[in-house]
Amino acid sequence: MKKDVKVLALDFGASSGRAIIGSFDGEKISLKEIHRFTNDPVILLDTMYWDVLRLFHDIKIGLIKAKQEGEIKSLGIDTWGVDFGLLNKDGKLLENPVHYRDARTKGMMEKVFAKLDKDTVYSITGNQFMELNTLFQLMALKENQPELLQKAETLLLMPDLLNYFLSNEKCTEYTIASTTQLLDAKNKTWSSEIIENLDLPKNIFTKIVQPGTKIGKLSKQISEELGIN
Protein backbone atom coordinates (compact mmCIF):
# COMPACT_ATOMS: atom_id res chain seq x y z
CA MET A 1 0.00 0.00 0.00
CA LYS A 2 1.14 3.52 -0.77
CA LYS A 3 2.73 5.35 2.15
CA ASP A 4 1.43 8.58 3.69
CA VAL A 5 -2.23 7.97 2.87
CA LYS A 6 -4.76 10.14 4.68
CA VAL A 7 -8.52 9.59 4.87
CA LEU A 8 -11.25 11.52 6.68
CA ALA A 9 -13.97 10.07 8.91
CA LEU A 10 -16.99 12.18 9.82
CA ASP A 11 -18.49 10.49 12.87
CA PHE A 12 -21.91 11.64 14.09
CA GLY A 13 -23.49 10.56 17.35
CA ALA A 14 -26.82 11.58 18.82
CA SER A 15 -25.27 14.38 20.89
CA SER A 16 -21.96 15.24 19.20
CA GLY A 17 -19.86 14.77 16.10
CA ARG A 18 -16.22 14.83 15.13
CA ALA A 19 -13.92 14.83 12.14
CA ILE A 20 -10.98 12.44 12.37
CA ILE A 21 -8.07 11.97 10.00
CA GLY A 22 -6.71 8.46 9.69
CA SER A 23 -3.12 8.28 8.40
CA PHE A 24 -1.07 5.31 7.23
CA ASP A 25 2.69 5.79 6.95
CA GLY A 26 3.48 2.38 5.54
CA GLU A 27 3.82 0.74 8.95
CA LYS A 28 1.13 1.98 11.28
CA ILE A 29 -2.24 3.71 11.32
CA SER A 30 -2.67 6.85 13.41
CA LEU A 31 -5.78 8.90 14.18
CA LYS A 32 -6.07 12.64 14.74
CA GLU A 33 -9.23 14.46 15.76
CA ILE A 34 -9.34 17.80 13.95
CA HIS A 35 -12.85 19.04 14.71
CA ARG A 36 -15.50 18.33 17.37
CA PHE A 37 -18.97 19.81 17.68
CA THR A 38 -22.29 19.35 19.46
CA ASN A 39 -25.39 17.85 17.88
CA ASP A 40 -28.34 19.55 19.53
CA PRO A 41 -31.98 18.84 18.59
CA VAL A 42 -34.30 21.75 17.87
CA ILE A 43 -37.93 21.77 19.03
CA LEU A 44 -40.28 23.79 16.84
CA LEU A 45 -44.08 23.77 17.23
CA ASP A 46 -44.03 20.56 19.28
CA THR A 47 -41.83 18.66 16.81
CA MET A 48 -38.24 17.68 17.58
CA TYR A 49 -35.88 18.03 14.60
CA TRP A 50 -32.24 17.40 13.84
CA ASP A 51 -30.42 20.61 12.93
CA VAL A 52 -29.07 19.03 9.76
CA LEU A 53 -27.96 22.30 8.15
CA ARG A 54 -25.84 23.10 11.18
CA LEU A 55 -24.36 19.59 10.99
CA PHE A 56 -23.54 20.14 7.33
CA HIS A 57 -21.86 23.42 8.25
CA ASP A 58 -19.65 21.48 10.68
CA ILE A 59 -18.83 18.99 7.93
CA LYS A 60 -17.55 21.90 5.85
CA ILE A 61 -15.42 23.10 8.77
CA GLY A 62 -14.04 19.58 9.11
CA LEU A 63 -13.16 19.48 5.42
CA ILE A 64 -11.38 22.83 5.60
CA LYS A 65 -9.37 21.69 8.61
CA ALA A 66 -8.60 18.37 6.91
CA LYS A 67 -7.25 20.21 3.88
CA GLN A 68 -4.69 21.87 6.14
CA GLU A 69 -3.35 18.42 7.09
CA GLY A 70 -2.45 17.49 3.51
CA GLU A 71 -4.08 15.58 0.68
CA ILE A 72 -7.13 13.56 1.74
CA LYS A 73 -7.72 10.51 -0.46
CA SER A 74 -11.28 9.78 0.61
CA LEU A 75 -13.92 10.44 3.24
CA GLY A 76 -16.73 8.51 4.85
CA ILE A 77 -19.68 9.39 7.07
CA ASP A 78 -21.36 7.40 9.82
CA THR A 79 -24.36 8.42 11.94
CA TRP A 80 -27.06 6.95 14.15
CA GLY A 81 -29.77 4.91 12.46
CA VAL A 82 -33.50 5.12 11.63
CA ASP A 83 -33.84 8.87 10.91
CA PHE A 84 -34.08 10.29 7.40
CA GLY A 85 -34.67 13.26 5.16
CA LEU A 86 -37.11 13.52 2.26
CA LEU A 87 -36.21 15.21 -1.03
CA ASN A 88 -38.65 16.55 -3.60
CA LYS A 89 -38.42 16.02 -7.36
CA ASP A 90 -35.88 18.85 -7.60
CA GLY A 91 -33.62 17.27 -4.99
CA LYS A 92 -34.51 19.84 -2.34
CA LEU A 93 -34.98 18.89 1.32
CA LEU A 94 -38.69 19.02 2.18
CA GLU A 95 -38.14 19.55 5.91
CA ASN A 96 -35.46 19.05 8.53
CA PRO A 97 -35.21 15.37 9.54
CA VAL A 98 -37.37 14.59 12.57
CA HIS A 99 -35.60 13.29 15.68
CA TYR A 100 -36.21 9.66 16.68
CA ARG A 101 -37.23 10.92 20.16
CA ASP A 102 -40.14 12.86 18.70
CA ALA A 103 -43.57 11.66 19.82
CA ARG A 104 -45.04 11.28 16.32
CA THR A 105 -44.63 7.49 16.30
CA LYS A 106 -46.82 6.83 19.37
CA GLY A 107 -49.53 4.36 18.41
CA MET A 108 -48.00 3.62 15.01
CA MET A 109 -46.99 0.05 15.87
CA GLU A 110 -50.65 -0.88 16.28
CA LYS A 111 -51.53 0.72 12.94
CA VAL A 112 -48.77 -1.22 11.19
CA PHE A 113 -49.73 -4.54 12.79
CA ALA A 114 -53.35 -4.00 11.79
CA LYS A 115 -52.17 -4.21 8.18
CA LEU A 116 -49.26 -6.64 8.47
CA ASP A 117 -48.73 -9.40 11.00
CA LYS A 118 -46.01 -8.72 13.57
CA ASP A 119 -44.40 -12.13 13.06
CA THR A 120 -44.26 -11.51 9.31
CA VAL A 121 -42.45 -8.21 9.78
CA TYR A 122 -39.94 -9.83 12.11
CA SER A 123 -39.35 -12.82 9.83
CA ILE A 124 -38.55 -10.46 6.94
CA THR A 125 -36.40 -7.91 8.73
CA GLY A 126 -35.09 -9.48 11.94
CA ASN A 127 -35.30 -6.07 13.60
CA GLN A 128 -36.18 -5.39 17.21
CA PHE A 129 -39.55 -3.63 17.46
CA MET A 130 -39.06 -0.04 18.59
CA GLU A 131 -41.45 2.85 17.96
CA LEU A 132 -38.57 4.98 16.68
CA ASN A 133 -37.82 2.67 13.72
CA THR A 134 -38.11 4.16 10.25
CA LEU A 135 -41.05 1.89 9.47
CA PHE A 136 -43.17 3.53 12.18
CA GLN A 137 -41.93 7.02 11.31
CA LEU A 138 -43.17 6.51 7.76
CA MET A 139 -46.50 5.22 9.04
CA ALA A 140 -46.78 8.40 11.13
CA LEU A 141 -46.21 10.48 8.00
CA LYS A 142 -48.75 8.46 6.04
CA GLU A 143 -51.35 8.93 8.78
CA ASN A 144 -50.70 12.54 9.72
CA GLN A 145 -48.77 14.24 6.90
CA PRO A 146 -49.70 12.37 3.71
CA GLU A 147 -49.04 15.49 1.65
CA LEU A 148 -45.36 15.34 2.63
CA LEU A 149 -45.03 11.76 1.38
CA GLN A 150 -46.83 12.72 -1.82
CA LYS A 151 -44.26 15.44 -2.49
CA ALA A 152 -41.33 13.14 -1.69
CA GLU A 153 -39.24 11.75 -4.53
CA THR A 154 -36.40 10.32 -2.42
CA LEU A 155 -35.81 9.08 1.12
CA LEU A 156 -32.24 9.22 2.40
CA LEU A 157 -31.12 8.04 5.82
CA MET A 158 -28.93 10.44 7.74
CA PRO A 159 -25.44 9.38 6.55
CA ASP A 160 -26.72 9.05 2.99
CA LEU A 161 -28.38 12.46 3.21
CA LEU A 162 -25.11 14.08 4.29
CA ASN A 163 -23.28 12.22 1.51
CA TYR A 164 -25.86 13.59 -0.92
CA PHE A 165 -25.25 17.14 0.31
CA LEU A 166 -21.56 16.65 -0.48
CA SER A 167 -21.77 14.73 -3.75
CA ASN A 168 -25.31 15.00 -5.21
CA GLU A 169 -25.34 11.18 -5.29
CA LYS A 170 -28.41 9.33 -4.00
CA CYS A 171 -28.04 5.84 -2.58
CA THR A 172 -28.56 3.90 0.66
CA GLU A 173 -25.73 2.07 2.40
CA TYR A 174 -26.70 -1.46 3.42
CA THR A 175 -25.90 -1.40 7.14
CA ILE A 176 -27.83 1.82 7.75
CA ALA A 177 -30.74 0.42 5.71
CA SER A 178 -30.82 -2.50 8.15
CA THR A 179 -31.96 -0.12 10.92
CA THR A 180 -35.18 0.83 9.13
CA GLN A 181 -37.25 -2.36 9.63
CA LEU A 182 -37.92 -2.13 5.90
CA LEU A 183 -34.99 -4.23 4.66
CA ASP A 184 -35.43 -7.84 3.58
CA ALA A 185 -32.56 -9.44 5.50
CA LYS A 186 -32.52 -12.53 3.30
CA ASN A 187 -32.54 -10.80 -0.09
CA LYS A 188 -30.62 -7.72 1.09
CA THR A 189 -33.00 -5.34 -0.58
CA TRP A 190 -36.05 -3.28 0.33
CA SER A 191 -39.00 -5.45 1.34
CA SER A 192 -41.67 -5.09 -1.31
CA GLU A 193 -44.06 -7.08 0.92
CA ILE A 194 -43.85 -4.55 3.75
CA ILE A 195 -43.84 -1.50 1.49
CA GLU A 196 -46.82 -2.69 -0.58
CA ASN A 197 -48.94 -3.90 2.36
CA LEU A 198 -48.52 -0.57 4.12
CA ASP A 199 -49.13 1.35 0.88
CA LEU A 200 -45.88 3.28 1.17
CA PRO A 201 -44.48 4.95 -1.97
CA LYS A 202 -41.98 2.56 -3.58
CA ASN A 203 -40.26 5.27 -5.58
CA ILE A 204 -38.69 7.01 -2.56
CA PHE A 205 -36.36 4.12 -1.76
CA THR A 206 -32.98 4.33 -3.49
CA LYS A 207 -30.57 1.64 -4.61
CA ILE A 208 -28.69 -0.13 -1.81
CA VAL A 209 -24.89 -0.19 -1.87
CA GLN A 210 -22.50 -2.20 0.25
CA PRO A 211 -20.17 -0.70 2.88
CA GLY A 212 -17.02 0.78 1.38
CA THR A 213 -18.62 1.49 -2.00
CA LYS A 214 -17.23 4.60 -3.68
CA ILE A 215 -20.36 6.59 -4.44
CA GLY A 216 -18.78 9.60 -6.13
CA LYS A 217 -16.79 12.77 -5.63
CA LEU A 218 -17.37 16.12 -3.97
CA SER A 219 -19.74 18.15 -6.10
CA LYS A 220 -18.33 21.00 -8.16
CA GLN A 221 -20.17 23.51 -5.97
CA ILE A 222 -18.70 22.13 -2.73
CA SER A 223 -15.22 21.82 -4.23
CA GLU A 224 -15.25 25.43 -5.40
CA GLU A 225 -16.76 26.76 -2.17
CA LEU A 226 -14.16 25.04 0.04
CA GLY A 227 -11.23 25.17 -2.38
CA ILE A 228 -10.85 21.39 -2.39
CA ASN A 229 -10.18 19.38 -5.54
Where are these regions (language model features)?
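N-terminal glycine/serine-rich phosphate-binding loop of ATP-dependent small-molecule kinases
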Residues: 1-95, 123, 206, 223-229
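Gly/Ser/Thr-rich active-site cleft segment
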Residues: 12-14, 121-229
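Short, glycine- and charge-enriched coil/turn segments that flank and shape catalytic ligand pockets
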Residues: 27-28, 70, 116-119, 146-151
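Surface "functional belts" at beta-alpha junctions
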Residues: 98
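Carbohydrate-associated surface elements
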Residues: 102
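Hinge/lid segment of periplasmic solute-binding proteins
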Residues: 106-117
